A protein has these predicted regions:
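A short, conserved structural fragment
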Residues: 58-67, 144-154
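Solvent-exposed, charged amphipathic helical/linker segments at domain boundaries
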Residues: 90-99, 145, 152-153, 160-161
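N-terminal helix-turn-helix DNA-binding core of bacterial DNA-binding proteins
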Residues: 2-49, 60, 71-73, 97-135
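Hydrophobic, helix-prone linear segments
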Residues: 1-16, 20, 24-26, 64-65, ...
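Transmembrane alpha-helices
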Residues: 39, 44, 50, 54, ...
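Basic, amphipathic "hinge/linker" alpha-helix immediately C-terminal to the N-terminal HTH DNA-binding motif
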Residues: 67-88, 157-176
Length: 207
């Protein structure tokens, strides 16, 4: 997926936090501190990956140790981010879907285009000048897998396919419209707070 996103954020902090496990960790710690084994069990992640993510989130001052160094809790900055993301999880959108959609260049734009009305596939793809049909098809397939959109066939000659938002897709678009600007502001604050060279970018294969 493209590293450039719908909020115009493509820096290392954005890439680091908007990954599958980082989002899941922030959301899991929203309701209170947890120890390492509890987090690993809840997330179903290996100890190696969890350790790496916890170190990086700690380096960003989003989490800190608690219980005398035996557990982890959110900092004020981490809590602010988790409070922005938590409403999506409460509506049934998983952390994995959140990061996949928000980090993608095209998925948020596609969802927003479908916000007002259903659209034919060719019409929807044509509304984005820079997207190829191959990339468009891949993104639509993913959005269907995430149960954010649905498609239906119009019995015409030739047969045409039309797309619309699922209820969960409407939840995501509503969240983007209501909280997108604030999310961008929080990430810019976080980016400014980092000293040059302080954050090591995460390799794509661990996201």
């Amino acid at each position: 997926m493209a590293s450039e996103d719908w909020l115009g954020l493509n820096g290392s902090v954005w890439r680091e936090v908007m990954c599958k496990w980082s989002v899941a960790i922030l959301v899991s710690l929203h309701d209170g501190p947890m120890n390492f084994s509890g987090l690993a069990k809840r997330l179903g992640v290996s100890n190696k990956v969890l350790s790496k993510k916890l170190r990086r989130l700690s380096g960003l001052s989003l989490i800190s140790e608690s219980y005398g160094g035996k557990g982890y809790m959110l900092t004020d900055a981490g809590l602010e981010l988790s409070q922005l993301l938590k409403p999506l999880v409460a509506e049934g959108v998983s952390p994995a879907v959140i990061q996949a959609v928000l980090r993608c260049k095209w998925m948020p734009q596609i969802l927003r285009a479908l916000w007002l009305r259903d659209m034919f596939a060719s019409e929807l793809a044509g509304s984005f000048e820079e997207i190829s049909w191959k990339v468009f098809s891949e993104r639509m397939k993913k959005l269907e897998e995430f149960q954010l959109i649905h498609r239906y066939v119009i019995p015409s000659h030739p047969v045409r396919v039309k797309y619309g938002l699922e209820a969960r897709g409407r939840v995501v678009v509503r969240w983007m419209l209501q909280r997108g600007a604030l999310l961008r502001e929080k990430f810019l604050e976080l980016q400014r707070s980092q000293r040059p060279g302080e954050l090591i970018q995460a390799p794509d294969n661990v996201l």
